Amino acid sequence: QSIALFLPDRAVLIEEWADIPLSEYLSKIEEIAPRILECRETPRYLAHTATLRATFALTHFSDARVFLLDHLCKQENKIGPHFQRPIATGGLRFVLPESNDHIGNLTVIIESFRHGRNEIFVEVKGVFGREPVAADSIGVILENTQSVRAFISERIFPYLEQFDHPKDLFS
């Protein structure tokens, strides 16, 4: 479902539980982003965010919690005794600040997917405020959204893939 949410200080475009190509989502942004500026009588966006989510199925692990917490983070038998309850989901969170070489602050969440035992849920939120974006330069928002998607496929997937091997390879 497509949602446009208008708040006093921001507009949020959401494609929730959507299996659409990124190009289709970018077309929606390209269409509505200039209109929002016009309706609000605002010359530019001072900042924008792009949040993209994906899931990855594991090849050699049937439980994403075991993969992330026990295998990747080496927490086997170290969590339960302290928290004394089962873990529904668990994972990692990284905050990657903007630099001269990389535009935008990225918040990366990698966790077990509660709807699929052997799947990893990934969310990357990019916050871009380096340059204001006017109606005639909406392409900047599209490029930054594409860069968030590229980060998932070119950085996170290979990062996880290096650990998704049979356990005996690491013993």
Show which residues each predicted segment covers.
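Short beta-strand-to-loop capping motifs
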Residues: 14-18, 54, 126-130
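Aromatic/basic-lined ligand-recognition segments
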Residues: 47-125
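Extended intrinsically disordered, low-complexity coil regions enriched in Ser, Thr, Gly, Ala
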Residues: 20-28, 38, 140
